[in-house]
Amino acid sequence: MSAPEADPLVLFHKWMDEAEKAEPNDPNAMALATADAEGRPSVRMVLLKGADQDGFVFFTNLESRKGQELAANPHAALCLHWKSLRRQIRVEGSITRVSDEEADAYFATRARASQIGAWASIQSRPLTGRFELEKRVGEFAAKFGLGKVPRPPHWSGFRLAPRRIEFWHDRPFRLHDRFDYVRDGDGWHLEHLYP
């Protein structure tokens, strides 16, 4: 790996651009780790939908397990791993909800079937069978007909404001490169870590 950038977001976007060219499926897939109010962790894959100086954005059902955990404990970590590139990025930080306007704008870009699915899925609740879900999808499809599907009140997005971003690049004999950026006021403090 060449000398790291002073701004981790510049390096992040370079790596993401390379991942989008190299990864066949969902290069923006990331493991999102949350914890409940008692500190019990859970992790799942979600899709990164935006990254800038304000943070890393993803969208979800607010009533899901992750939504409830983020409401109770607004701290999280995410990890993007691209096996074909032998790279990984880990991010830690605090969580805030995106604005209703931002959530509405993203929701409007989703496929209609995904919009209806956001209404139909009572995410993380027990499901007696596939037919129950398909029935709910049909009910909401009939409700909205050919009209616009509004964003459900229980569906929005979160922004992880990074306080630490670590870039890992595989090297022979486990002598990997690790560059750790820690928020320092308005800038970043960079350290090269032992593998």
Swiss-Prot record:
FMN binds at residues 44-49, 59-60, 65-66, 88, 123-124, 168, 178. It holds the Pfam family PNP_phzG_C. Binds 1 FMN per subunit. Substrate binds at residues 49, 106, 110, 114, 174-176. It comes from the Bacteria. Its cofactor is FMN. It is an enzyme of class 1 (oxidoreductase). One of its GO terms (molecular function) is FMN binding. InterPro entries: Pyridox_Oxase (IPR000659), Pyridox_Oxase_CS (IPR019740), Pyridox_Oxase_N (IPR011576), Pyridoxamine_oxidase_dimer_C (IPR019576), Split_barrel_FMN-bd (IPR012349). Keywords: Flavoprotein, FMN, Oxidoreductase, Pyridoxine biosynthesis. Pathway: Cofactor metabolism; pyridoxal 5'-phosphate salvage; pyridoxal 5'-phosphate from pyridoxamine 5'-phosphate: step 1/1; Cofactor metabolism; pyridoxal 5'-phosphate salvage; pyridoxal 5'-phosphate from pyridoxine 5'-phosphate: step 1/1. GO terms for biological process: pyridoxine biosynthetic process. Its EC number is 1.4.3.5. PANTHER family: PYRIDOXINE-5'-PHOSPHATE OXIDASE (PTHR10851:SF0), PYRIDOXINE-5-PHOSPHATE OXIDASE (PTHR10851). Belongs to the pyridoxamine 5'-phosphate oxidase family. Homodimer. This is Pyridoxine/pyridoxamine 5'-phosphate oxidase. It comes from Paramagnetospirillum magneticum (strain ATCC 700264 / AMB-1) (Magnetospirillum magneticum). The gene is pdxH.
